[in-house]
Each structure stands twice: as C-alpha cells, then as structure tokens.
C-alpha cells in the first residue's frame, strides 16, 4: 500500500510530477497512450505500480482529493491513466459532488466531458443529493449552469425531500433561483406538503427570492402543513417579506394544519416584531375594506338610474352589507365544513347551498317586488376560487374578499388554477369538487312555489364553469317584455360599467384532452336526478388578459371553441329545460317539449357529448363555418358574434301576455364550460381540431385562420329545416359513440396562427324559419352572405400556407383514449409500460401480433381488434422519407419523441447518423439498455430496414472486457447464446454484435464500475419516494473482504417494500445429490448448457421468465402471462453464483422443504452485465434480510422478524472450494440467525475462462 498512499498524498497536495512518476509505468490512456499489445515489462510495471482507483480510510480516491482541492492538472492526469469518475466514498460522494460543492466549474466540465470515464450528473450520495444540490446550496451559479446544460434532473429530492430549487431558496441564492426557474418553471408547482421554495425563502427572510418566485408565477397562497408563506414569515419575524406578500394579495385568513391564522400565531409569540407584523396586517385589511367601499359607491352611482332588486348583500349601507355578507358566508362555510366532517353526500351539500340562496331571495321586500314584478330576474351566483382573488365587478381585483368557501369545497387549498380541476381532487371520488354555477331563472312572481326545487336542481347539476368570486349579481333585462331569461356573465364584467382586470392564472392549464377528460368525470350525475343545466350564449366584456375556451353542449352536439376576449353588447337570451332520454328520440322533439312538463332523467348523456358527439337532432341547411375574429379597437367594443346571437323559437306574443306560462315555452338548453387560459400560452400548444373537408360533396367543418390567432365557430344562419328521423338515427349511430379520437393535431407553423375546433355541430329550432318577420330574415341572410365570403377567403389562404393539412394525421390523444375508442381500455398499462406510449408511433410497421402476445395480451380476439385499429394509424416514416434527413442524433431522437435516450446514445459512442443506421436490436438491448420493446421497435422503424446482407464481422482484437484487476482477456459467450436464438436469417453472429457494441461503449473505461441503477429507481429517486433508509447496509467490500464492489445496486427500501425484476432465460434445474457450494452450481450450469446445445429445437423451447428479487426471496414469474410459478424464500437459497465458463449464465441453489432435497436452477441473462447485476442484487437481498434480522434480535422483538427468518434453522458452513478465498470471521451468536454474506471474487487462472472474475454469494 506504500505506492497507493503516495499517489493519494500527491493528488491531495497537487504534486503533478509525483503523480506522473507513479503512474508512468502504466499504459497511457486515450490522451497519451498508443494502441497495440503491451510488452511484458509494462505489464509487470502495472502489477507493481499503484492502483489508480485506490482509496483511503474515508473512501476517497486520488480523483476525489484532486477534485476537492481544485488540482485541475492532477484530475487530467488521473483521467489519462483511466481513473474512474464513478467511485463513491464512504458517504456516497462522487468526485463531481466535491467539485460542485467547491464551485470549481472547470473540474466539473472535465469530469463530465473529458473521459475516458465520464461522470453521471444525476448520481446521488447517501443523502440522495446530486451535484446540483451541492452547487445550488452554496450558490455556485456557474456550476449550476453547466449541470443544467448537461440535463441534470432538478426534480430529484434529497433525503429531506428538498430539490435544488428548495435549497437555493432556503439559503437565498438569488442567481441560482433565477437560473433554475428559468430552465424548469414547472418546478414551482412540484411541491410537497412539507415545504415549497416560497415558504423556505419567506422563513429566512430572503425578500428578493420571494419577489422573484412570485414574479415567475408561483402561487402566493400555496399552502403546506405550516400554512401559507405568510405564516412562515410572520413566525420568524420577517417584516419585509410579510409586506411583500401582503402587497401581492395573499389571504391573511388562511389557516395552517392546526387551524391557526397568522394573527393567532402572532398572539402566541408576542414581541416587537410581532407587533410590527400585526400592524401591517391591520393596515392591509383596513385598506382593502376602504378600496372595496369606494368601488362599491362608484358602482352604485353608475347604476342609480337602473331598477334593481334589493338584497342584504347589496345594501347601500357599508356596515349592513359587510355584516350581512360576512354573516352569510360564515354560516355557509360552517355548514359546508360540517357536511365534510360528517361525510355527507354531494346532494346534501348542494341542498345546503341552495337553502342559503333561497333564504336570500325570501328576504326581498314585497314593496320592491311590486315595483319590479314585471322585470325578469337575472341572478348569477359564483363561488370564490381562492383567497385574495376576487374578480367582482364592484371590488378591486387585489382586494381580499370573502374567503374559505372554495377551500371547503376543494381538497387542494390555495391552488389558483382558474377553470381547471386539480389532479389531487381525484382522490375524492364521491364529491364533485368542481366549479359550480348557480343560475336561478325567471321572475319570482311567475312561479314562486317552484323556487326551492328549481334552485336545488340547479345547484345539483349545473357544473359548468369555475367562478372567480362569490356574488349575487342582478341586472335588469334590456328587453321590454316579461319573458323569463337567465344569463351567465363572465366574472368581473357588467352591462353598464367597465370591467376590472382580474389576475391571470398562475398555473399552466392542462391539454384539451386532459381538460375534457376531467370534465367528463365531473358531469356524471347520480341516476334519477332532476337536472337542468342552464347557461347563456351571452358572454360580455371578457377579460383581455385571458382566453376563454368553451364547451358548448346541446342535445347531442358538442363544440370546443377558442375565442378571443371580446365585448359584445347585451343581447336577449332564451333558455329552458330539456328532457334527456338517452339515445331515444322521437320524430317531433319540439312538440314533445311543448306538450310535456319537465321530467326526471339521467344526464349521463352529457358525458358522452363531451367526448365529441356530433349533432343528433336537426341540422341547418348549411354546415357550421369557422371564421376568424379579431378585436376591433382598444376600447373593447366588438360587434355581436353570431355564435352569441339568439335563435328564434315559437312562444306566445309577450305584448299580449304580461305573465306568460312558463310550461309552454320550452326553448333548447345550451351549456358552456369556460376555461381561463393565458393568451400567449396557446401559441406554443399543439392545436386540436377536426379534419378539413375539401370536397364540395361532403359537409364538414372548415378551418379559418386570422392574424390574431383566434378561431371561433359560428352558425351560418340560413333556412333551418327538419331532418327525417331515419337521417337523425343514422347520424346518431355514427357520432354518438365517437370519442376524442376525432381530435387531429395541426402543428402551427406560425405562432400567430391557431386552428381550434371540434367536430361539426348544428343548432335546431322548433319551428320553421318562415315565421320570422321579413326584415329579420333579410338581415340574417345578409349576414350569412358576408360570413360565407369571409369563410371562402380564409380557406383559400389556409390552403396556400398549409398544403399538407389534408394528409392523414395521427389523432392527438393518449393511448388510453385510443384504446377506449376501440373498447379495450383495460390494456392501457400493458401498452404504456412496454413502450407503446404514443399513438403517433404505433403504426402497423411498429407493432405486430407477436409484440402484443409478448406484453401479455393473450386474448386473440382482442389482439386482432387492436391490430385492425393500428391499420388506421399512420405508418412510421423512416428517415430519408420526404427528404427529411436529421443532422444529429439528438434531432432524430426528438423527432420520434425519445429524446430521453440522447445521452445514452452519445455516451455509448453513437454520435452520428451513419453509426445509427447500422445499429441492431441486440445493441439496443445490451449496449443502450433500452428495455421497452415499443421504444426499440420505434427506433428500428425510424431507421428503416436492416442491412441483412451486411452483418457484423469478426471484432478486432483490441476489443476486450475490462476488469477491476486490469487484466485483459477476450470475452467468450456460451455456445448456447451463439446458436439460432437471436439469429436473423442465419446471418447474425450474437457474440460479435455484443462485442462490437462493447467496443463503442466501453473503449478503455472500467466496465464494472459504471453500472447504472434501474430506470424505475431513478424515477423513484426523482419523485422523492425513497427517503432516509430505514436500515444501514454494509457496502459489499465491507460485508466481505474479497470483493472490490463498493456500492449496492439498489436502495434498501426497494428490496423491502417492492422488488427488483429481471428478465432471463430459464435453462432448467438439476437435483443436487451432494451440496458442495459453487461447485454444484458449476456442474448444473455445464449440464444445462450441454442440453441446450444438443438441438436447435431444444433451444427454441427455452422459456423467458422474470426473477423478482426482494428481501423475502425470489419469485419465479412467467414473462408471457405474468403468473407466479414458484417462490423461493431467502432462507432456502444457499448459494448463488455466475458460471465461470460463461458469465452470462448464473444459478442459485434452493432447498425443497417437502422432500428435503436441493435443486440448482440455471438461468442465462441477456448479457454479462445483467447477470452480474442479478447476482449483486441477490447479495444485497441477503444483506437486507440479515440487517432486518439483526434489528429484530437486538430489539428483543422476535415477532418483528421477517417472515423468511422466523424459525430459520442454522446451516453448516461449507468448505471453501478455492484456496484463495478469504475466510470471514463470524460471530457464533449471529450464525443462529443469519450468517455473514461473503461475496467472492476468484481471479480466473485457467485459460479456458473467458473473463477471469466471477461473482458469487453463499449463505451459511
């Protein structure tokens, strides 16, 4: 160890000359050494020289010392002599961790790029921290920039569930915070219940960081267990941060998990700081109250000439109004929370709400009812979305209005996601926690006896729009008649005053598919509910900072429309109730509506409508057209949209009937769901729409594009005629069962151009258009001509700029939606888990029947149905088709949406498209470790046909497998693997392919030191599912003195709570008459390989199985049908080892408790590396089980022993087979529970062995 110690000391002190002298006897690396065989003298000097990867007592290698002390030249020299960058010290730190902690950007770059050994940027230490955590915590912005460029995952959480952004915010690293949120803005929404970056920054008083986070769009009202960020800042006395949060509009009434507000916390900690903060809060609340009063007085002056119904919530007296609103909200909130605590049904909750509104209406005085009895009541009640966010037309947008109601209705408190249900709400399936709009209709003097039921059914089912404020807004109808009418007005809008600008959404909205899916989950009411979904076509003065996406549903049609924020003038609207009878329709729907009163019906049909059904009743003579519409001037004035214009229907003349009978007026119902969305975000989204109809013989939707980037559907109002029932039924059969597969992707070529629509819709009328007055008809015909001319011009422009729009395109939908459209949603997990996760890349040249069988779809009828549906999907076009030639590997992978593999390709030497065109599927499996068959098939389909006439040739002699000992011997695979198992037309030589892949992958790198963890574990680490290990494992090299392996493959919790699954070929088992440890495994392996080599037919029968390894043992699972064949307990496994003749073959010995016989089970892995990992995982499973048993024994709780170790008999220690095996001293007291787990490395001395190191484990 003398030279090793000298090397370590020279690296620590920066003595370049001594390092070079000590390592000069070794062969030079890629920077200084030549190629070719080494003379004997050099080999001897290597034997006598120091080990470049030797470690000291703390686990530091020379590279650790050099990186920590900033010796750049030493780092370069060590890498030149093949030092490994992926050796961890005793605390799990890699050299890149130390360089990032020190802030040495040059050394970080060298470790990542220089080679031959390259650092893995996402490697974690024992605290689960990456190098990005170290750099972010200490504010090394240059290092952070380099790591972000190298695709370091910023979502990985350490053992305290902290991301790099959390650490930067906690320690006030402003520049780092800006860099991370600029590169990954989605991190601000990926928070835990323990903390958020905003809470951490507020707690430590980092005012600048708090401002940056809020400016970047972080929700100021986001909550954790400790409440809002205001709680944290107040508790720790950060006055400046409190001031910033209050100015941003945070709700001061938010409560923490203990039910305490900020003022409650201040009372518990009286101090000078608490007094200052309390004063700030008081001034803020008083200022908000004054601003609300001023705006209300201004609003009342504007409406002083209007006739309005009085209400306690709109009293001119400030004190009366404030007390009334506060009292009503308090009572309502208490009852809602009571309903939640007692787990009442949603119907009870809605009944509670409706009772309050009924009470409000009953308070209207008889005097004002007499004055306004001839006026129609327009009532729109909406519910506050989140504290501090009020868009009431009479309140300042930054004021703090009534709070707590929406939090009581939704499980995700404080998340401002305007118009979109949170994903967390799916855990509350019994409560429809989506926005509700309560729209009571008609004058009170018309049918006062029906108010209660009417309000109840409206509350129960009118789930159409997420409101943004709690208000009871009333406005008189501009009409002169007494017809009952209902209107939904956009939040913050009014008929007679300018609207206030409300806050824009802080969260990015989901895709249209996700939105539709969430809506469908909501609009599924309980059966036999009386339902009336009432809304209006009249949306006025919409906020100019937002876009509104509508879902307008009528009896059998759905439109999905994106419209710009417009301000059409007030127009009269007629709405009514409809009767839904599922798929049953009569010849005369209008007569049925006029003759029959409303009945109870199942509104489940609306769920189907939102999936894209087309009109099922009457259609206009001309199809609907899309036309572009832009804002006309900055004053917000806009002509009335045709989509918002009323449709005529027959009713009794109002002039002759002041109090019309409501039952005789049954106009149709149209409901709309409004989604708020940032205007600029739409430009970067994939646009959804319908196929364009070019031919004149087919009536379909057409596309319109305008410079403003907005598209809206409008009805071409021509003659409306009734359709025969047969045509209606045929139309229903074609469209009612349609799913979202009608949605087609049209990538926008210009950010200003947006195409958005849904399948074509049609409006119906109960009577013919001939009953219109002549002037009315002529006006609509004139408008019809104008719209047609606009439509023609727009479509001609679209044809010129988007010529390929008529090409068949792949529907923009998930695999689950596609499977649902063909009636097989149960196979979604089968497809996505195996790489068939994108319908754009699942054409007939990608997926085959054998693939479906392999992934576990055993029903032949279902496979045929899937294959038939796949024929309708577009085939993948190989590179070079249509002149497309990607210039880089990254560009090509991004084009097939497999960009995550970019780094794997580049690291393994696939740096050009020429190399990629020669890649084989075996290389994808063995070299690139692409285990998902769907991704492999996608890659091969994109690369085109394989050149079977040019198979890989014999590898050059320089290709070798590298071992820790430094010896070089060419790998030899078993004859069984070189047979026809993997052959293609008899021309594929498997050993040569694997060695060619190894040549590109390893070059001169250390082969066994750079084994990555499984993909599942990387995902678990990124999501923070693994926390602090519950047990402490000894490293393999400490568990046994004879192994060089320094770290395990998996997190201990993985083997305790889950399992590690590996695919392998099962060659068979052999009865062991005399148990001789690894000698028995060698004999069994040799016999099984000999059996497979006897005939090709025998080799074809070798089954593929899955070994599921955990601390309990090994489950033996059939890979075809996922059935568990057998389960071998850990206590019954006595030995596991690789075969020295073929390291890809391994075996383990189990004991049959019934017969008391031992059997050796033999497997062949896909490559040597996988076999090594399986054996190492088995060893870790033994270690985990052993440590669990020790914990149970030391704690004195025998009942806590794992099941596999209870009543475990002791076993004799077998005699070592090879003399160089180092004995392990074992405490006799520990032998009774579970013995030490030695890992044995036996340097091969026989020339017949392909690789001279094998990995074994033995249980005594």
Swiss-Prot record:
Entry keywords, A to Z: ANK repeat, Cell projection, Cytoplasm, Nucleus, Phosphoprotein, Repeat, Synapse
PROSITE patterns per record: ANK_REP_REGION (PS50297), ANK_REPEAT (PS50088), PID (PS01179), SAM_DOMAIN (PS50105)
Biased composition (Basic and acidic residues): 576-588
Biological process, per Gene Ontology: chemical synaptic transmission, postsynaptic; ephrin receptor signaling pathway; postsynapse to nucleus signaling pathway; receptor localization to synapse; regulation of synaptic plasticity by receptor localization to synapse
Post-translational modification Phosphothreonine, affected residues: 504, 773
CDD domains recorded: PTB_Anks, SAM_AIDA1AB-like_repeat1, SAM_AIDA1AB-like_repeat2
PANTHER family, per the entry: ANKYRIN REPEAT AND STERILE ALPHA MOTIF DOMAIN-CONTAINING PROTEIN 1, ANKYRIN REPEAT AND STERILE ALPHA MOTIF DOMAIN-CONTAINING PROTEIN 1B
Name of the protein this chain belongs to: Ankyrin repeat and sterile alpha motif domain-containing protein 1B
Organism encoding this protein: Rattus norvegicus (Rat)
Gene: Anks1b
């Amino acid at each position: 160890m003398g030279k090793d110690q000298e090397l370590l000391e020279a690296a620590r002190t920066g003595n370049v000359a001594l390092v070079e002298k000590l390592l000069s006897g070794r062969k030079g690396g890629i920077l200084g050494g030549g190629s070719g065989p080494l003379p004997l003298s050099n080999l001897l000097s290597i034997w006598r020289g120091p080990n470049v990867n030797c470690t000291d007592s703390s686990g530091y290698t020379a590279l650790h010392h050099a990186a920590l002390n900033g010796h750049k030249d030493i780092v370069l020299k060590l890498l030149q002599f093949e030092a490994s960058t992926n050796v961890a010290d005793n605390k799990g730190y890699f050299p890149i961790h130390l360089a990032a902690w020190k802030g040495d950007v040059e050394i970080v770059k060298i470790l990542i790029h220089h080679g031959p050994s390259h650092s893995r940027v996402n490697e974690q230490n024992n605290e689960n921290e990456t190098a990005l955590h170290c750099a972010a915590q200490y504010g090394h912005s240059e290092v952070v920039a380099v790591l972000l460029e190298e695709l370091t995952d910023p979502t990985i959480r350490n053992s305290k569930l902290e991301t790099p952004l959390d650490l930067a915010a906690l320690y006030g690293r402003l520049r780092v915070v800006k860099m991370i949120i600029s590169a990954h803005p989605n991190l601000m929404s990926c928070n835990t219940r323990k903390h958020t970056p905003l809470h951490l920054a507020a707690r430590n008083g980092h005012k600048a960081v708090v401002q940056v986070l809020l400016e970047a769009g972080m929700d100021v009202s986001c909550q954790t267990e400790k409440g809002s960020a205001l709680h944290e800042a107040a508790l720790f006395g950060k006055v400046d941060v409190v001031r910033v949060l209050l100015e941003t509009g945070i709700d001061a009434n938010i409560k923490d998990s203990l039910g305490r507000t900020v003022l409650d916390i201040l009372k518990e900690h009286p101090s000078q700081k608490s007094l200052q903060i309390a004063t700030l809060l008081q001034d803020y609340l008083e200022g908000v109250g004054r601003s609300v009063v001023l705006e209300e007085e201004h609003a009342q002056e504007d409406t002083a000439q209007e006739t309005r119904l009085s209400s306690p919530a709109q009293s001119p007296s400030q004190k009366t109004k404030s007390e009334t609103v506060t009292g009503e909200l308090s009572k309502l909130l208490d009852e809602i929370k009571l309903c939640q605590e007692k787990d009442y049904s949603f119907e009870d909750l809605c009944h509670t709400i409706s009772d309050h509104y009924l009470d409000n209406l009953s308070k209207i005085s008889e005097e004002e009812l007499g004055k306004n009895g001839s006026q129609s009541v327009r009532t729109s009640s909406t519910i506050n979305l989140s504290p501090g966010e009020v868009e009431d037309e009479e309140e300042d947008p930054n004021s703090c209005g009534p709070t707590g109601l929406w939090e009581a209705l939704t499980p995700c408190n404080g998340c401002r996601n305007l118009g979109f249900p949170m994903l967390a709400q799916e855990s509350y399936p019994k409560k429809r926690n989506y926005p509700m709009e309560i729209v009571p209709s008609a004058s009170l003097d018309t049918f006062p006896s029906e108010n209660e039921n009417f309000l109840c059914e409206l509350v129960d089912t009118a789930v159409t729009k997420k409101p943004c404020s709690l208000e009871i807004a009333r406005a008189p109808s501009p009409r002169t008649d007494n017809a009952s009418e209902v209107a939904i007005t956009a939040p913050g809008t009014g008929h007679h005053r300018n609207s206030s600008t409300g806050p824009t959404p802080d969260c990015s909205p989901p895709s249209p598919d996700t939105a539709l899916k969430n809506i469908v989950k909501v609009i599924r009411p309980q059966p036999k509910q009386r339902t009336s979904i009432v809304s209006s076509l009249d949306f006025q003065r919409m906020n100019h900072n937002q876009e509104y996406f509508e879902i307008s549903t009528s009896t059998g049609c759905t439109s999905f429309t994106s419209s710009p924020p417009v301000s059409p003038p007030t127009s009269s609207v007629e709405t009514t109730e409809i009767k839904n009878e599922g798929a049953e329709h009569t010849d005369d729907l209008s007569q049925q509506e006029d003759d029959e009163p409303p009945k109870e019906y199942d509104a489940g049909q609306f769920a189907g409508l939102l999936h894209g059904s087309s009109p099922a009743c009457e259609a206009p003579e001309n199809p609907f057209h899309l036309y572009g519409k832009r804002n006309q001037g900055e004053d917000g004035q806009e002509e009335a949209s045709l989509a918002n214009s009323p449709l005529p229907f027959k009713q009794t003349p109002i002039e002759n009937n002041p109090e019309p009978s409501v039952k005789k007026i049954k106009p149709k119902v149209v409901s709309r769901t409004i989604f708020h969305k940032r205007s600029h975000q739409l430009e970067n989204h994939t646009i959804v729409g319908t196929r364009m109809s070019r031919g004149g013989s087919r009536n379909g939707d057409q596309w319109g594009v305008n410079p403003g980037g907005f598209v809206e559907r409008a009805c071409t109002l021509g003659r409306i005629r009734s359709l025969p029932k047969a045509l209606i039924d045929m139309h229903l059969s074609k469209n009612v069962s349609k799913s979202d597969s009608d949605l087609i992707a049209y990538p926008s070529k210009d950010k200003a151009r947006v195409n958005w629509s849904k399948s074509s819709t049609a409006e119906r009328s109960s009577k013919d258009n001939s009953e219109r007055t002549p002037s009315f008809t002529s006006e609509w015909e004139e408008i019809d001509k104008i719209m047609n001319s606009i439509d023609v011009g727009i479509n001609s422009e679209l044809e010129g700029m988007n010529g390929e729009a008529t090409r068949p395109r792949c529907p923009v939908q998930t695999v689950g939606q596609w499977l649902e459209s063909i009636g097989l949603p149960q196979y979604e997990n089968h497809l996505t888990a195996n790489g068939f996760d994108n319908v754009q890349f699942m054409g007939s040249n990608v997926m085959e029947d054998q693939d479906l069988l392999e992934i576990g779809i055993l029903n032949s009828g279902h496979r045929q149905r899937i294959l038939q549906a796949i024929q309708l999907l577009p085939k993948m076009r190989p590179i070079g088709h249509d002149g497309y030639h990607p210039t880089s590997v990254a560009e090509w992978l991004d084009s097939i949406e497999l960009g995550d593999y970019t780094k794997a390709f580049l690291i393994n030497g696939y740096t050009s498209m020429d190399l990629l065109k020669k890649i084989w599927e075996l290389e994808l499996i063995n070299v690139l470790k692409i285990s998902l068959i769907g991704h492999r098939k996608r890659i091969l389909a994109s690369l085109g046909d394989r050149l079977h006439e040019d198979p890989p040739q014999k590898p050059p002699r320089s290709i070798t497998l590298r071992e820790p000992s430094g010896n070089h011997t060419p790998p030899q695979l078993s004859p069984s693997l070189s047979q026809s198992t993997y052959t293609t037309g008899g021309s594929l030589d498997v050993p040569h392919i694997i060695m060619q892949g190894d040549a590109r992958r390893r070059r001169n790198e250390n082969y066994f030191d750079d084994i990555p963890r499984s993909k599942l574990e990387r995902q678990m680490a990124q999501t923070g599912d693994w926390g602090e290990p519950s047990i402490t494992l000894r490293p393999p090299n400490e568990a046994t003195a004879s192994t060089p392996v320094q770290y395990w493959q998996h997190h201990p919790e993985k083997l305790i709570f889950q399992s590690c699954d590996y695919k392998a070929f099962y060659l068979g088992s052999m009865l062991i008459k005399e148990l001789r440890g690894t000698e028995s495994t060698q004999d069994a392996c040799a016999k099984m390989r000999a059996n497979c080599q006897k005939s090709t037919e025998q080799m074809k029968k070798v089954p593929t199985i899955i070994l599921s390894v955990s601390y309990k043992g090994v489950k033996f699972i059939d890979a075809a049908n996922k059935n568990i064949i057998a389960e071998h307990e850990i206590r019954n496994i006595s030995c596991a080892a690789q075969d020295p003749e073929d390291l890809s073959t391994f075996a383990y010995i189990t004991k049959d408790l019934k017969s008391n016989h031992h059997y050796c089970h033999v497997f062949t892995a896909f490559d040597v590396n996988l076999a090594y990992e399986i054996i190492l995982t088995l060893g870790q499973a033994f270690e985990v089980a052993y440590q669990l048993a020790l914990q149970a024994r030391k704690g004195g709780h025998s009942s806590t022993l794992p099941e596999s170790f209870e009543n475990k008999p002791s076993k004799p220690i077998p005699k070592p087979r090879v003399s160089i095996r180092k004995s392990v001293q074992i405490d006799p007291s520990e032998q009774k529970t579970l013995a030490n787990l030695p890992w044995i490395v036996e340097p091969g001395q026989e020339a017949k062995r392909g690789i001279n190191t094998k990995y074994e484990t033995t249980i005594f």
